[in-house]
Amino acid sequence: MRNYEVVFVIRPDLEAEATTAVVEKFTQLITDQGGQVTRVDQWGKKRMAYEVRKYREGYYVLVEFKGTPAVAQELERVLKISDDVIRYLITRLEEEAS
């Protein structure tokens, strides 16, 4: 299993409960696909450098997880079609040297 991290930006006009539900939806997707969530860090609402889909700010979330490339591909597919996510980036973390 490889280490990945995903940062995604949620629409700022969602209620707090809806924002929490979006985060839980993606962490549940990772575990359902056989991955393991190691860290969830909600950075909160921040101003973006430029306008994205007519939004000047967004709710930032960082999730670190372990999984196969198939887990990352499925997560990317779902993030891409989600209306609540305005931007995302999945990166593979380097393995720690022993």
UniProtKB/Swiss-Prot annotation:
Q: Which InterPro entries match?
A: Ribosomal_bS6, Ribosomal_bS6_sf, Ribosomal_S6_plastid/chlpt, Transl_elong_EF1B/ribsomal_bS6
What protein name does the entry list? Small ribosomal subunit protein bS6
Taxonomy of the source species: Bacteria, Bacillati, Bacillota, Clostridia, Moorellales
In the UniProt record, the gene name given for this protein reads rpsF
Q: Which Gene3D superfamilies match?
A: 3.30.70.60
What organism does this protein naturally occur in? Moorella thermoacetica (strain ATCC 39073 / JCM 9320)
| Functional note | Binds together with bS18 to 16S ribosomal RNA.
Query: Could you name the Gene Ontology cellular component terms for this entry?
Result: cytoplasm; ribonucleoprotein complex; ribosome
Matching entries from NCBIfam families are given as:
S6 (TIGR00166)
Family under the similarity heading? Belongs to the bacterial ribosomal protein bS6 family.
